[in-house]
């Protein structure tokens, strides 16, 4: 979905479809959640606010971290994502997405972070990830819909996980929650001024209330715990 090259392994497309967004960008993003039973209400709201039509997706995502040794334990987030197929073979094309540390701008109404996306082909992705020094933190599957409003992307999805690592049959996949995750974002050139886009994203998010309260989630505070004061 994000800066992906749409590659058809079955050979049914005549040419590749390439997203024109540069691979290295900055991203403004907000997160929210809604009970799964209320998703139809959200979809009706989005149908009235967004561009015509939406796109369904079913994806497998793994989150890896790369920790640097030193005085502080710095954690770098790497996301691996691929289309998830239940009836056909799983694709070996992955989106490799680096997510940078959010900007420490308390006045900005959204999360702002650097991201780098690229496409990787591998029949043994775990071996490739380990060769990069990455360690998997968790994995999950997402199934939902993508909407757009100009350059704003809106995703809502149900998250599921497998009870046995590496096994993805219907008996092993279980729902994570009775709620759906909602994410809205804007991608900008790496050096662009982000505040106008962030305010525009916040204004759009406010139109989803009271169905969804989109928030600037301080997830990085858990990623980077405060250091203990040195002993004297």
Curated annotation (Swiss-Prot):
Task: Report the protein's function.
Answer: Component of the Mediator complex, a coactivator involved in the regulated transcription of nearly all RNA polymerase II-dependent genes. Mediator functions as a bridge to convey information from gene-specific regulatory proteins to the basal RNA polymerase II transcription machinery. Mediator is recruited to promoters by direct interactions with regulatory proteins and serves as a scaffold for the assembly of a functional preinitiation complex with RNA polymerase II and the general transcription factors.
Q: Where in the cell is it found?
A: Nucleus
Q: Which GO terms describe its biological process?
A: positive regulation of transcription initiation by RNA polymerase II
| Key words, A-Z | Activator, Developmental protein, Nucleus, Transcription, Transcription regulation
Q: How does it assemble?
A: Component of the Mediator complex.
Q: Which family does it belong to?
A: Belongs to the Mediator complex subunit 18 family.
Q: Which GO terms describe its molecular function?
A: transcription coregulator activity
Name of this protein: Mediator of RNA polymerase II transcription subunit 18
Main location, first listed in the record: nucleus
UniProt gene name: mdt-18
Q: Which organism is it from?
A: Caenorhabditis elegans
InterPro entries in the cross-refs: Mediator_Med18 (IPR019095)
Q: Name one GO cellular component term.
A: mediator complex
